[in-house]
Every structure is written in structure tokens, then in C-alpha cells.
Amino acid sequence: MPAPAATRRDRIEDELGAHNYQPLDVVLARGSGVWLYDTAGRRYLDCLSAYSAVNQGHCHPRILAAMVEQAQRLTLTSRAFRHDQLAPLYEDLARLTGAHKVLPMNSGAEAVETALKAVRKWGYEARGVPAGQAEIIVCANNFHGRTLGIVGFSTDPDARGGYGPFAPGFTVVPFGDFAALQAAVTPRTVAFLVEPIQGEAGVILPPPGYFRQVRKLCSERDIVLILDEIQTGLGRTGAFLAEAHEGIEADVTLIGKALSGGFYPVSAVLSNQAVLGIFQPGQHGSTFGGNPLACAVARAALRVLHDEGMIDNAREQGAYFMQRLRALPGPVREVRGRGLMLALELEPDAGPARAYCERLMARGMLVKDTHGQTLRLSPPLIVTREQIDWACAQLAHVLAHSAPGSSGGPS
């Protein structure tokens, strides 16, 4: 029988909360490093990292200390006034990424919307595209956020169904299909928005050489290449930005999530004078964007990533995790990914991935399913080889006991 407190909590959530999520049936109360703890004190290995927002691990003490210190001094001024934390964040991001202009926002979706506004305005004012005719190319199975503007160019029926009419000006092409991208370009194309690795689609990597072709095309046709690194960036793939694996540089880079280490919503648009210089006072803004608390937290989160070798660890442990995953028994169709952004796709007859997530949860491991048959595996970047070995033991048990023809669920 569920405890009375749990029953009351569930009833309140059901009655008062909007039902736009379907979480696993665990109630978490505490986190530390790679571990999460439920209200009964049971421990779980976090293999989602809040969609890569807690790359540095839960409740990292250095980020927490920076947040508390700044919260005791100054939290919010709005951008109506200057404050002493903004310039240092600009310098840190410029040094780490090579960006010449930085525009801080809050959520990842806000950063995406900001970039879309900037490139449209750039297209009209710098490229001379006729007013109201700018086109932006995006990819099928994309995920860039949940705002009305963004879901308008989603191809996910759940994400876009029932929300129209949508803004015009977006062309959808298959991810990784350079010929399709090339054919979609017109004189009115101002930008190509793309994820280096499609996360929500199931950790889908592009074909080798694809992004070098994309970079060349965008340069030749004066098209702004926007890389959405909100999930792939900040060490997740074993490089500070995933573009490094492709040997290219985007014109606009979007970062967020782990930019705060999970403590606070912080995102940023990184670009150059040509694109971000297009905004004049009053043409774009955000009350909380670039606030003192956000800047202090982001700077600490960036320092922790580098000082503690987390990016190198993601590369090394990611390669080891991939090797172990490929050796797993059971109904595994494919293992793919880069660094610690990994996915295990099940065979079509293996049953829904969510059932495997539920069985893994019962064994102390929290994993998120996506697109029906795929398990996403993205632990914090501090994960150790021993913890990976333990995770693979749980996966092996669940896969072996859940395969078609097996005796049923795990013991």
C-alpha cells in the first residue's frame, strides 16, 4: 500500500497539475554527483542528467557556493542598468568559443528564438532579402524547444499538433542529407538551423563529412549556419562544443542547459558583429537574461567543467561506455553516440523502451526513453568506469530478462 503522504502528493499532482509530462513513478528528493535519491532514501544512478543540464553532476559544491555568494550580493537588475558580472561572463565565453558577440538569455528555446529573430533581421538589413520573404532551413525530427514559433517547424505530431496556424518561412529537409539541403536553398535562404547530433530523435549522428559540406555551402551562399549546441555542447560529446568533432565553426552557436550546471536557467547566443550587431536598443530583450546571479553561476559552471577535467572524462568514459554497450546481450539493434551522449536502440519486436526504463528504475538506474524503441544514456560527465560497469550490469540483466522469448521481467 502506498504511504498516505505519497497518495496525497500523487492526488495533488493529478488534480492541480497540467498533464503535459508522463514521468517515471519515482519521487526524487536529493541529488549528489551522479546519484539521485528518492523520498525513501533509495539511490539511483542518473543516466539522463536532466537532458544534459547537469553535466557537472548534481549540486556541485563550487557552483552552489558561487550561487549563494552572488545571491547574497545582487540577483537581478534587469538590463536597464549595468552590473559587474556581465562583462566577465562575456570574456569567458569569448575566450572559450571564439565568439565576437554574446547575447545571454534564460532557456534554450529563448536562445533559439533569439537566433531566428537575428538572422531574419540580418537577412533583410544586410543581405537585402525582400521584406517578409526570408527563409530558414531546418531538419526533420529536430528538437529546438516548445515555443509556438519553434513547434511550427517541428515534424513531431505531439509537439505541433493542435497549435496552428504557424509562422511561414521554414523549409524542412532530412537530417544528414546534403543533397536535399542543397536543393532547398533559394536566394531568400538566410540560415540553416541544425543540431550537431539530434538528441530527442534518438541520438542520431550525421554521415561523416556532412557538416564540412554544410559549412562550405553556407559560406558560398552567404547563409548563416546556426548550430544548436544546447544539449551537445559544454563537454557532453567529449569536446567543449560538438562542432569540434566536425572541424568546423558555426556562424551562430546556441548553448544552455549545462551552462548553469543545473542550478538556474541560463542560455546564450554566440555569434559575430554581423549577426548580433543587427539588434539595436529596444529591438530585443529579456528581463532576466544576463542577470547577475545567472552570470555568476554560469562562470562557475564553466570553470568547473575545465578545472576538473570533465570534458576529457566524457571523451574517455564515453568510449568505454560505448564499448561496453556494444557487448551487451539481448534485443539491441544499434548502439550509437559520441562522448557521453549515447543511445541504445532496441529491436522492433523488443517492446516499448519505456518498459525497460521502468525495470531499470527498479534496479536503481534512471534512464529516459525516446521515440518508442530507444534508451538514452547521458550520465553526468563525472561518471567513473566503475559506475559504468555497474550500469552495464543492470542493462545486461534487464535486456536478458526482457528479450522476446525470455521468462519475463527481471527478478
Swiss-Prot record:
Identify the domain of life.
Bacteria
Q: Which UniProt keywords apply?
A: Amino-acid biosynthesis, Aminotransferase, Cytoplasm, Proline biosynthesis, Pyridoxal phosphate, Transferase
Pathways per UniProt: Amino-acid biosynthesis; L-proline biosynthesis; L-glutamate 5-semialdehyde from L-ornithine: step 1/1
What Pfam families is this protein classified in?
Aminotran_3 (PF00202)
**Residues where N6-(pyridoxal phosphate)lysine is found:** K257
> EC number(s) on record?
2.6.1.13
Does the record carry Cytoplasm as a key word?
yes
Question: Which cofactors?
Answer: pyridoxal 5'-phosphate
Identify the main location: cytoplasm
Instruction: Say if the entry is tagged with keyword tRNA-binding.
Output: no
An example of a GO molecular function for this protein is: ornithine aminotransferase activity
Disulfide-bonded cysteine pairs: these are none
Annotated GO CC locations:
cytoplasm
PROSITE patterns recorded: AA_TRANSFER_CLASS_3
* Catalytic activity annotation: a 2-oxocarboxylate + L-ornithine = L-glutamate 5-semialdehyde + an L-alpha-amino acid
Spell out the subcellular localization from the entry.
Cytoplasm
Its GO biological process terms? L-proline biosynthetic process
Q: CDD domains per the record?
A: OAT_like
Described function? Catalyzes the interconversion of ornithine to glutamate semialdehyde.
Query: What family is this?
Result: Belongs to the class-III pyridoxal-phosphate-dependent aminotransferase family. OAT subfamily.
What is this protein's record name? Ornithine aminotransferase
Name the gene for this chain: rocD
